[in-house]
């Protein structure tokens, strides 16, 4: 700059000189002009070149910075000296609170003005981020439970950290903190490291063979008939064993007929499903869970889970096994170290209610910090599925009926699905589980539980032909599972469909005989029956008429009008309910139901659905749709919601 200024001054001087006499030579002036002009051009060129290079340097991105950031994201080198941070004074605390208040104010202003909240305001903090991260980690290891929960809550609310700070937490936190983050609704998935690499399969092996090997290694003695059936079915339905059986009537000279061979081939996926169903049954036995873990089952199941992302049934069975294993607290370290918490945290955020509910059950069984109950196989919490500060004041239990399930029985009416197929599906317009979507929003202080058990109309369609479970047997089995889940400790309402209502009645009668279950009786505030055959079902009558063709199951036989067990159950329940202070609401269908493609039957007539206690409301639907409201504003849902709110009004206020 000084050189350019000097050139300008010289030019001005030349321009201000008076004309010289003709006696002096003009060449000297020309030489001076050329000298000054050259200096000006050279100096200006150097200045412009310098500015261009400086600007280019400032605009270039140093890729080494990105590489260093990547390394820091996965590996932390040293631990921050948190001891000295405890001595920070009130000035630091004041600055921290002031900055937090300003950040919240900016976020609120951005929301009001509908403009994006600049990341620079959220990532730039007065305090040292790394020190804050290590302070939270230290707080999460304190002996005080409240302090640990507060630390996890603060971690889950952090959404503007750098990637490496989430990785520091992921690598340095203890298992209970990791589980707490997985059960926190707002947790960032960057808190969870990918599962460790799976061991390679043995040479010339497959997942099918590994599954069969794991199943064969489990104890085969002292098993009930159904578990023996599932195990033998899975071990026999292998491609190798069927290939060895291709002889016989369809084989001549050792060469099987081509079409006969096609009959014997079982797809690998089918064999895997047989094995998984057998392992599910084994995982209900605590001692067998130890054998599954020792045999590398956690890694093998994870391989199946990753391979069958497009098969929800496989994934649900895998999660059922992990959820059953999580009931055993001594297996928690193995489950955490194998990477299942990361997978469950991701599944919990799924938009598919069934997948999220299976993950919620597994994580709840792992979380011993905030959950005292244990959710056994077939018991699913629909709400709340995450840690919450909302106090839970009452329970609502959903019990399905014949051929039902914990989720599909309580879906919205199928006619509404077609209306939303071409549009973006809004959960308020269609839901696959209205207790989870609608009731949880309308009554957030309720714990909503749905249970599942196997049923069949015919022994031909039974999953286990040897299974002969009466209503009395199933009610005792369900009652034991519900007590393990803490049912009876709070005020509660039972909601049942079809045979599920008979199970509710039997469970209450059984509980009344046991002094330790008095709390369950006293806390029962109400029961809703959706088309429950208190006096028998016409389905049972029809099944008896064609019993040699249909082979009705034991459950169906017990629903006949002349069933002594059904009449005794009705009489005993009416006697039991005389001095009990709970409300009853009965719904009943008025339309017949198609059973198969040819049979049309009024499954539960009005006279059979009349318990003799409470209101009886006929609804113009069939037996399957009596518990499936068309919309959130439909009479079925609104009347159910009204009953719940009125029955639990005093408990919800408290």
From Swiss-Prot:
GO terms for biological process: extracellular matrix organization; intracellular cholesterol transport; phosphatidylglycerol acyl-chain remodeling; phospholipid biosynthetic process. It comes from the Eukaryota. It is found in: Mitochondrion membrane; Endoplasmic reticulum; Mitochondrion. Disulfide bonds: none annotated. GO terms for cellular component: endoplasmic reticulum membrane; extracellular matrix; mitochondria-associated endoplasmic reticulum membrane contact site; mitochondrial outer membrane. The chain crosses the membrane at residues 32-54. InterPro entries: AB_hydrolase_fold (IPR029058), ARM-like (IPR011989), ARM-type_fold (IPR016024), SERAC1 (IPR052374). It is a single-pass membrane protein. Belongs to the SERAC1 family. Facilitates the transport of serine from the cytosol to the mitochondria by interacting with and stabilizing Sideroflexin-1 (SFXN1), a mitochondrial serine transporter, playing a fundamental role in the one-carbon cycle responsible for the synthesis of nucleotides needed for mitochondrial DNA replication. Plays an important role in the phosphatidylglycerol (PG) remodeling that is essential for both mitochondrial function and intracellular cholesterol trafficking. This is Protein SERAC1. The gene is Serac1.
């Amino acid at each position: 700059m000084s050189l350019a200024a000097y050139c300008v001054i010289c030019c001005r001087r030349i321009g201000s000189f008076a004309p010289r006499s003709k006696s002096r030579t003009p060449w000297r002036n020309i030489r001076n002009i050329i000298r000054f002009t050259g200096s000006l051009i050279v100096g200006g060129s150097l200045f412009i070149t310098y500015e261009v290079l400086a600007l280019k340097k400032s605009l270039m991105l140093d890729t080494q910075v990105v590489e260093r950031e990547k390394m820091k994201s996965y590996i932390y080198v040293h631990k921050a000296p948190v001891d000295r941070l405890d001595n920070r004074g009130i000035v630091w605390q004041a600055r921290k609170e002031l900055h937090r208040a300003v950040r919240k104010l900016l976020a609120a202003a951005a929301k009001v003005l509908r403009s994006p909240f600049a990341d620079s305001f959220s990532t730039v903090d007065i305090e040292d981020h790394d020190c804050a991260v290590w302070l939270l980690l230290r707080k999460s290891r304190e002996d005080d439970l409240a302090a640990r929960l507060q630390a996890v809550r603060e971690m889950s609310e952090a959404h503007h950290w750098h990637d490496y700070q989430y990785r520091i937490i992921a690598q340095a936190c203890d298992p209970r903190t990791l589980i707490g983050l997985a059960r926190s609704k707002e947790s960032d998935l960057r808190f969870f490291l990918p599962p460790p690499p799976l061991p390679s399969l043995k040479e010339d092996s497959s997942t099918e063979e590994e599954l069969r090997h794991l199943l064969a290694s489990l104890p085969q003695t002292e098993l009930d008939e159904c578990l023996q059936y599932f195990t033998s079915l899975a071990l026999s339905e292998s491609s190798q064993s069927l290939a060895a059986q291709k002889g016989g009537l369809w084989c001549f000279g050792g060469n099987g007929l081509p079409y006969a061979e096609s009959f014997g081939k079982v797809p690998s996926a089918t064999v895997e499903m047989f094995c998984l169903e057998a392992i599910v049954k084994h995982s209900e036995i605590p001692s067998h869970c130890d054998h599954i873990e020792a045999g590398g089952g956690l890694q093998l199941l994870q391989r199946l889970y990753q391979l069958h992302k497009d098969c929800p049934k496989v994934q649900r069975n895998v999660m059922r096994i992990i959820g059953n294993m999580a009931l055993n607290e001594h297996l928690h370290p193995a489950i955490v170290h194998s990477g299942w918490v990361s997978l469950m945290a991701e599944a919990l955020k799924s938009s598919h209610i069934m997948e999220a509910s299976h993950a919620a059950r597994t994580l709840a069984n792992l979380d011993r910090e905030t959950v005292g109950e244990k959710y056994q196989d077939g018991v699913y919490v629909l709400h709340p599925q995450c840690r919450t500060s909302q106090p839970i004041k009452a329970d609502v239990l959903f019990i399905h009926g014949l051929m039902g399930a914990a989720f599909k029985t309580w879906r919205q009416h199928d006619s509404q699905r077609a209306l939303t197929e071409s549009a973006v599906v809004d959960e308020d317009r269609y839901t696959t589980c209205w207790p989870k979507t609608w009731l949880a929003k309308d009554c957030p202080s309720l714990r909503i539980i749905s249970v599942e058990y196997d049923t069949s109309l015919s022994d031909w369609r039974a999953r286990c032909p040897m299974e002969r479970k009466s209503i009395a047997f199933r009610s005792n089995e369900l009652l034991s599972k519900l007590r393990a889940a803490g049912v009876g400790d709070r005020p509660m309402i039972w909601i049942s469909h079809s045979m599920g209502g008979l199970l509710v009645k039997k469970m209450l009668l059984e509980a009344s005989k046991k002094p330790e279950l008095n709390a369950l009786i006293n806390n029962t505030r109400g029961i809703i029956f959706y088309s429950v055959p208190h006096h028998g079902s016409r389905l049972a009558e029809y099944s008896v008429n064609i019993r040699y063709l249909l082979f009705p199951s034991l459950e169906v036989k017990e629903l006949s009008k002349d069933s002594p067990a059904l009449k005794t159950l009705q009489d005993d329940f009416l006697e039991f309910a005389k001095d009990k202070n709970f409300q009853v609401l009965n719904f009943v269908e008025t339309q017949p139901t198609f059973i198969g493609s040819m049979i049309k039957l009024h499954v539960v007539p009005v006279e059979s659905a009349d318990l003799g206690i409470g209101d009886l409301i006929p609804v113009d639907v069939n037996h399957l749709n009596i518990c499936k409201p068309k919309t959130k504003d439909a009479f079925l849902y609104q009347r159910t919601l009204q009953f719940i709110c009125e029955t639990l009004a005093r408990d919800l206020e408290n």
